[in-house]
Amino acid sequence: MLENKNHKKMSLSGKSLLMGTLSTAAIVLSASTVNAATTNADNVTKNQTVAVSATTTNNETNNQVSSSSEKTADSKTEKDTNLTSAATKEVKADAAKTTSPVNNVKTVADTTTTTKETTDNTEKSPVNFSADVKKNDAVKQDEKAATAVKANTEVKANETSTKSASKDNKAELKGQIKDIVKESGVDTSKLTDDQINELNKISFSKEAKSGTQLTYSDFKKIAKTLIEQDARYAVPFFNASKIKNMPAAKTLDAQTGKVEDLEIWDSWPVQDAKTGYVSNWNGYQLVIGMMGVPNTNDNHIYLLYNKYGDNNFNNWKNAGPIFGLGTPVIQQWSGSATLNKDGSIQLYYTKVDTSDNNTNHQKIASATVYLNLEKNQDKISIAHVDNDHIVFEGDGYHYQTYNQWKKTNKGADNIAMRDAHVIDDKDGNRYLVFEASTGTENYQGADQIYQWLNYGGTNKDNLGDFLQILSNSDIKDRAKWSNAAIGIIKLNNDTKNPGVEKVYTPLISAPMVSDEIERPDVVRLGNKYYLFAATRLNRGSNDDAWMAANKAVGDNVAMIGYVSDNLTHGYVPLNESGVVLTASVPANWRTATYSYYAVPVEGRDDQLLITSYITNRGEVAGKGMHATWAPSFLLQINPDNTTTVLAKMTNQGDWIWDDSSENADMMGVLEKDAPNSAALPGEWGKPVDWDLIGGYNLKPHQPVTPIPNVPTTPEKPENPTTPNTPDTPHTPTTPNTPDTPRTPEVPTTPVKKTTQSELRS
C-alpha cells in the first residue's frame, strides 16, 4: 500500500554541507562544495584564483581520501606547501597593489613576484621619463617591495602563532572512536572541532533494542543488488502484451455505489493459519483485495472467488466490498484471513480513519465474515459481518501510537500500524505479525544517528556513512525520523473476538535506516519460520542509494526476507543483507510490480509462490492501464539461507501452484521490439513521473531453471567385495538314545498301627 498514505515527499533541495567544507580528514565530501569553488573561481581576479585553486586541490584530495583513506607523507607535505604558497602569494599580491593596478599583477610561484611586477611597470612607463626619474621610481619600488616582504613575514608569524594557539585548544577524540578513526587512516589533525565533537557523541551499545536490525549497511547492499540486477533476485520480466486489467474489478464501488472499473492492489488469500496453504472453501479459493477507483482516495477491501485450482484469470468473480457501500471516511487496508471451524472467515485488516484531516489513523482490526453459497448459480455472496472491532493500536513502548506520531513532524514522519498477518505456531497459539513503527523502547530521533549499531558495516565504512549523514541535510532529516518495524503480538483464545494476550518487541526494526517496511508475511517451511516484507527504498534515509537505483532501473522496490527457528525472535537476514527480490523495470511500465506476498507450495518445504500486483496505481503506465494482479512465479529457498528466483511463471492471479500452473507465454524479455517484450510500445525510455528519469541502465537477466521435482538417480555404488565363503557347519552327531527309566518300585501298603506302643515305635 503506497499511493494514498499521505506520505509527503521530503524536499531534496536541502542538500548542503552541515559542517562546512570537510577537511582532508573527512571520508565523505559533497561534490557540490568543489563545484561551488570552481564556479566562484571563474568570477574572481587572477590574484585570487591562486587561493581558490589551492582549496580545490585540497577538496580533490578529500575525494581521494574518501576512496582509500591511505595518505603518504609526501602528499601531506605537498598539500601543506600548496596552502602556504597560496597564502604567501595573496599577501605579496596585496602588497603590490600600492604600485600597480590589480589587472597588471602577474602571479607566479616564487619570490620573483615583486621583481616581475617592477619590471612590468617599468616597461609600461612613458618613454619621455628621464633616467633619474626611472631610477628614483626603482628605488621607491624596492623600498615598497621590502615593506611588503616585511609585512608578509609578520603575517606569517601571526598565522603561526594563531595556529599554535588553536592547536592547543583543539578538541580531542576520546575512547573507542579515537581508535576507529586512527584505524580508518584518517589524519586526526585535519578534523574540525565540530567533527570531533560529533564523533565523540557516538554510542557503542552492543545489543539491539528492538529485534533484528535492518542496518544502513544492509540498505546499501540491497540497493547495490537492485542496481546490479542480479538474476537470483531480480523480479522476472513479464510479457507486457499479455497483461490485462482484471475482469472481476468492474463492480460496485464501495464509496460511490456505482459500477466502476476499479484497480486492485494489495491482496491475500484465505489461508490455513498453521500451514499457510490456500484454504479450500466448499470447492472455492477465496482472496481478499484492496480495490478502488483510479486517482481517487478510495481504499476498500473486496472478496473475490474462483473454483479451487482454477488458473484462468477470467474466471475470478467479485462478491463485493466486505463492509458494504457508502464508507468514504472509514477505509480498509491490507491484512490477512483464515477459516473458522464453522466455515466463516476470520478477517484481520487495517481500519483507517481519515476524519482527522486525512492523516490516516491506522488500527489493526478483526471481524468475522459469513458467506452465502448458491452452488447452482456458482455464486458466493457476503451474508453478514460480526465482531468488527479494534485489536491493537500500539502500546507506546514497543510500538508508536497515533498520539505519539501526531506530536512529530507529520510531513516527514510515516505513520504505520497496519497489514496484520495471522499465523498459528506449532502448538496452535495464534499471532499477528504487522507493520509498525518503534516506540520509546528504541524511538526515532536525532540520537539514532549516533548509534553505531545502526550502521552494521566495518568500522571504516561506518565512519564514512556517519560523516555522509551529517554532511547532507536531507539524509540527516530522514535518518532522524526513520523507525520502521515489523511487530508481533500474541492473541488470546477467543477465535472470533480476539484480543491481545502479549505484546513482543519487534521482529525487525530499522531505526535511522527506513521509515516503511510493509506487508509482512510469515510462512513455516519445515522447522523454520520465514519472514518477508515489501519495501520502497525511497522510504529510506540513504538518498544516494535509492537515487542510484532510480537512475539505473527507474524504480526502487524490493522484497526483504529473514529466517528463524522461532516465530517470536531470532531472525537473521536471507542472502546476507535481507534482499530477496528487486525491481527489474521502471515504475511506469505496464510490467512494474509491488506488494510481494509469498504463498507456500503444498508438498514442498523449499519453494514459495510469489504473488504481487502489476502496474503501479493511478494509471502511471497510461490511461486505462489499471493496477491488476501480476503473474506469479516460484522462489527457491536454499538450505544455506539463500534464495533464487526460478524461471517458473503462471497466469495472472494464480495463488495455488500445481502441475497445471505454469505458463511460459507470460515470460518476457528485455528487448524493445520483441513480441514478448517487458515494455509496451512507447514505454522504452519514458521518464518516470516523480523524477523525470530517462536513459535507464537496464540489464537483461534470466531466472534459474529449476531442477524438476523428481528424485535424482543416486550415484552407482561401488561393487561390494565377494564375502568369504563361510565354513560349512559340521553335521551334528545323532544324540544318544536316552536310557529307558527304570520302573519305580511299587510301595508296600503300610500296616495300620493301633496301640500306644505301636504309635511310639
Curated annotation (Swiss-Prot):
Localization per record: Secreted; Cell surface
Pfam families xrefs: Glyco_hydro_68
Gene3D superfamilies xrefs: Glycosyl hydrolase domain, family 43
Compositionally biased spans, kind Basic and acidic residues: 71-81
UniProt activity-regulation remark: Calcium ions are required for optimal activity, but do not seem to be essential since addition of EDTA causes only a 30% drop in activity.
GO BP field: carbohydrate utilization
Catalysed reactions listed for this entry: [(2->1)-beta-D-fructosyl](n) + sucrose = [(2->1)-beta-D-fructosyl](n+1) + D-glucose
Record site feature (Transition state stabilizer), residues: 419
GO terms, molecular function: inulosucrase activity; levansucrase activity; metal ion binding
Keyword Transferase (UniProt): yes
Domain of life assignment: Bacteria
Gene Ontology annotations for the cellular component aspect, listed alphabetically: cell surface; extracellular region
Residues where Ca(2+) 2 binds: 413, 444, 481, 483, 515
Name the UniProt record assigns to this protein: Inulosucrase
Organism phylogeny: Bacteria, Bacillati, Bacillota, Bacilli, Lactobacillales
Gene name as annotated: inuGB
